[in-house]
Amino acid sequence: MKAALWYQKGDIRVEEIESGPPGPGQVKVKIKVCGICGSDLHEYREGPFIIPRKPHPITHRQGGPVILGHEFSGEVVALGEGVTQFAPGDRVVVNPLIYCGECHYCRLGQHIMCTKLGTVGFAADGAFAEYGVFYEYSLLRLPASVSDEMGAFVEPLAVAVHAVKRSRMKIGASVAIVGAGPIGLLVMQACLAAGAGKVFVVEPMKARRKISSETGAAAVINPTETNPGKEIAKLTEGLRSDLAFDCVGNQPAFDTAVKITGRRAVICVVGLSLKPIEVPFIRLWGHEKEVTFSSGYEDEFPAAISYLADHRVKVEKLISASIGLDKLVEKGIIPLIEAGEKHVKILVYP
């Protein structure tokens, strides 16, 4: 089969490799569509990033070559011994978390906190390939109302749904989103689906501001032209937002989240910063603001599928381009790195 293999930083090759049968408890899936995630870009630019630098305690994989890709939908084509919950022809998505099931956190159902955590597409082969083999427990069925393309958004939407859960958002709350990339746009829609009042978006890129307006934002603010804090204060009778999501993960974005939120507000940091971020302690303390973090998902995949199935979350406008697997690097990864302002999500068809 054809697969895109990460060998090292800056080195992803599309090659012909063997497509093996599923083992006990495993399911072989024909990959239909796979989205390119920001973490895939990190692996190309500065990896290994999430890819293990030493043998993973569960998969024993280390470095390359490894097949990237974890935002995907597919169709079951073969079953390993003992598989009872799926049949050939089932349309599925995969929760890519790899966890031990034995540690303190796994016993609590908090798999994202597993002390041996790994992820399909990094610590095990992923979905930038014609076929993939995955454990039965990780599969979820897609209803007929969710297309293959929509299915490729289940994983990032689960990230968004988890972030809303972590924020403890109250129904009717005013919400601000800092950064309208793929996750920010999905967090915005997940908030609305969960009962938010008005949702405001702070985003410098024109194309992403347009998508924000088209998918539910009450107001969209360009921080290069307007003071976001003052603008949101005007829109909320001086109170500013009850809740903000930092979906960027850098110092300016966090500073903005602090300025656009009111007293006793919650700031949920979803974006990942590779550098330390300074915190305005006095302001947070004096206004009794809470800062929380959201780094993945646990049991949010069914909710994400439901949101897509009944069209409470719409993803069509987030699709910037569709490409074949052979063009993964030159038409997918490199454009996202070099011209990110023109793209939101690029889908890959193996």
What does each model-identified segment do?
Residues 20-34, 49-104, 143-145:
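Glycine-rich beta-strand-centered segment in the early N-terminal region that forms part
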Residues 184-185:
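N-terminal Rossmann-fold NAD(P) dinucleotide-binding loop
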Residues 243, 251, 255-259, 298, ...:
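C-terminal hydrophobic helical "lid"/dimerization subdomain
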Residues 174-180, 192-256:
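Adenosine-nucleotide cofactor-binding segment
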Residues 91, 174, 265-266, 290:
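Short glycine-centered segments of the SAM/dcSAM-binding site in methyltransferase folds
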Residues 56-70, 98-178:
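NAD(P)H dinucleotide-binding glycine-rich loop of Rossmann-like/cofactor-binding domains
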Residues 271-288:
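Rossmann-fold NAD(P)-binding glycine/threonine-rich loop
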